[in-house]
Each structure stands twice: as C-alpha cells, then as structure tokens.
C-alpha cells in the first residue's frame, strides 16, 4: 500500500450506522426518554434483538420473557445499553475483515480488555463505562490498519 492509497482506503471505512450514531449521541447526553430510545432501537432489528437477548439473559433473573424494547431498556439501564450499542457499532464497522483470524484475535482482545477495564474501574470506584470504552477502542488502530491493508 502506498502513502497515496491510505487516505482513499480510510475514506472507504464504513461509518457507524445512522441509528447507532444517533443512539450514542442520545446515550452520551442527558437521556430524555426511554420511549424514544426504544423507538430508535427498533430502527435496527439486529441491535434490537441483542438488547432483548440481554434483557432476557440470566443476569437479570426475570421469570417472564421480555419482548418489549421499552421494558428491556428500563431493565438494562443506560450504562449497559451504551456499552452494548458501542460494541455493536464498532463490530459493524469492521465487518469487512471480521473473518480474518487476526481481526478475530484483535476483537476478542479488545472486548476482553473492555470488560476487565470496566471491572477494575468498578472495584476502584472509577467510571466503568469510560474504562469499558477505552478498553474496547484501545487497539482500534490495528483494526483500521487491517481494513486498509488486509494484505
């Protein structure tokens, strides 16, 4: 890859989907309405399914099945929803290289780092979401390079 090709390949990186971008904007500000968040989530069926899957996980110990995004958002909470949306958005951006073994290793490492960073932050009284985000994105340059120069 030549130095002239780098900007062209960087421009070819897929951006966050508009739904993910709007959700992150809302989640990083002062959330006005869980109803609006749930309506926004419904615009991306795959993301909505992940939210419902999380709400129905054993972590929340509900007896009945959660089938409403509004109930799921209330149950999960803003911080976990933000982490889920960010993780989903980053993963979608790097879908073009997702099948490469190196990309899978980088992704697993980044996700593990994010989870551990959040766990350490909670133990130390820090900001778990901020540390989760830092852990998730700490190696993003490696994924960008892999997308730009898969050879």
Regions found by a protein language model. Give the residues of each.
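Conserved alpha-helical "signature site"
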Residues: 1-151
């Amino acid at each position: 890859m030549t130095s002239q090709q780098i900007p062209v390949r960087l421009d070819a990186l897929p951006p966050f989907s508009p739904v993910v971008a709007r959700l992150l904007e809302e989640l990083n500000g002062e959330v006005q309405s869980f109803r609006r968040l749930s309506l926004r989530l419904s615009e991306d069926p795959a993301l909505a399914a992940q939210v419902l899957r999380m709400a129905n996980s054993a972590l929340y110990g509900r007896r009945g099945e959660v089938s409403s995004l509004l109930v799921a958002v209330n149950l999960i909470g803003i911080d976990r929803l933000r982490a889920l949306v960010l993780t989903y958005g980053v993963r979608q951006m790097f879908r073009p290289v997702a099948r490469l073994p190196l990309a899978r290793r980088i992704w697993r490492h980044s996700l593990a780092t994010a989870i551990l960073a959040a766990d350490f932050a909670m133990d130390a009284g820090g900001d778990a979401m901020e540390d989760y985000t830092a852990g998730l994105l700490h190696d993003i340059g490696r994924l960008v390079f892999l997308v730009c120069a898969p050879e």
